[in-house]
Amino acid sequence: MLLKFMYIYGIGCGLMPAPLKKGQFLLGYKQRWYLIYTACLHGGLLTVLPFTFPHYMYDDSYMSSNPVLKWTFNLTNITRIMAMFSGVLLMWFRRKRILNLGENLILHCLKCKTLDNRSKKYSKLRKRVRNVLFQMLLVANLSILLGALILFRIHSVQRISKTAMIVAHITQFIYVVFMMTGICVILLVLHWQSERLQIALKDLCSFLNHEERNSLTLSENKANRSLGKLAKLFKLFAENQRLVREVFRTFDLPIALLLLKMFVTNVNLVYHGVQFGNDTIETSSYTRIVGQWVVISHYWSAVLLMNVVDDVTRRSDLKMGDLLREFSHLELVKRDFHLQLELFSDHLRCHPSTYKVCGLFIFNKQTSLAYFFYVLVQVLVLVQFDLKNKVEKRN
């Protein structure tokens, strides 16, 4: 049900390469109508673009006397527009590639679904995935709602200009938020399949350990079944890794610009928080509460992104490596099984799942924490710059 909601949001925002029906992308006549709708939607986003930077925000708002607030406002808008354009261009120039990726992802999910035997382990996994997916959709909707409430609280006598600015910002915000949520959902689905593979590998290890304790030899039938299952799991794991790499390659530029947008928004939010805390900006208790929830939703979204990327890269490899080591003590299995196990281990060792953003830096939990620390440093620099301006004005 939650995946259906995400699909509806993706179709509504023009973020799908084509509509889906019974697990297959619709092409031809029906796709043509969807392309027309997407073109109109993207045309609308371009039409409202000039209203993103209204004059009254610089001359007749709370930031009119603070150059740092104007600078962060401009930078936040520019990075959001850049992220939005990266998504728009991706949908038009790489549509076939995204279609192929979507078809391969659906096929991979169907293969991994055959491993799910409705046992307690798989039920717990489904609940865990459902919980994360619910959080992603909740945070996306909450971020849009809170962003709209904050925009409505900005006072201005120019009502038409203010309304146009709110429409421009909300439409851009909806597009960017669901673009990031869509990428997170794709990675979450791949992580779900990886977890299914790990459960199946654990079950195979438990079965062989049971045979090791209770039998002197492993029958030909059981040996062949075990070897076949290990080979199947290895093939599915390699396919899962390939799809993860393909997702990162396809969405590399949008992810990089979304991370840049998150960084700038982070600086903007923390700096606003400092200004509100010092009572430099006049505000009501209602605006203060909404602002606090904006900060919470932003960091919640950042943590979800950080966790899902870490799950499909570093953590997935560590878990799989630990599971493969549990097979090392088995003695009843045949030489072919050990060779297949060695092949699995070599593949894992030679193809580590890491994500380099545009080939510049590895994105994982460690770099994310360093990024949060760097934001605080940047805000301290901005506060010092702000204090320097105040001293110069007094003199």
UniProtKB/Swiss-Prot annotation:
Any one Gene Ontology BP term: sensory perception of taste
Single annotated GO MF: taste receptor activity
Gene: Gr58a
Extracellular side: 54-72, 153-169, 272-288, 388-395
Positions in the Cytoplasmic compartment: 1-32, 94-131, 191-250, 310-366
InterPro entries: 7TM_chemorcpt (IPR013604)
UniProt keyword terms in alphabetical order: Cell membrane, Glycoprotein, Membrane, Receptor, Transducer, Transmembrane, Transmembrane helix
PANTHER family, per database record: GUSTATORY AND ODORANT RECEPTOR 63A-RELATED (PTHR21143:SF131), INVERTEBRATE GUSTATORY RECEPTOR (PTHR21143)
Family: Belongs to the insect chemoreceptor superfamily. Gustatory receptor (GR) family. Gr22e subfamily.
Name of the featured protein: Putative gustatory receptor 58a
Known glycosylation sites: N278
Location within or outside the cell: Cell membrane
Major place of residence: membrane
Domain of life: Eukaryota
Species, as recorded: Drosophila melanogaster
Membrane disposition: Multi-pass membrane protein
TM region positions: 33-53, 73-93, 132-152, 170-190, 251-271, 289-309, 367-387
Listed GO CC annotations: axon; dendrite; membrane; neuronal cell body; plasma membrane
General function of this protein: Probable gustatory receptor which mediates acceptance or avoidance behavior, depending on its substrates.
Tissue-wise expression: Expressed in the adult labellar chemosensory neurons.
Pfam families documented for this protein: 7tm_7
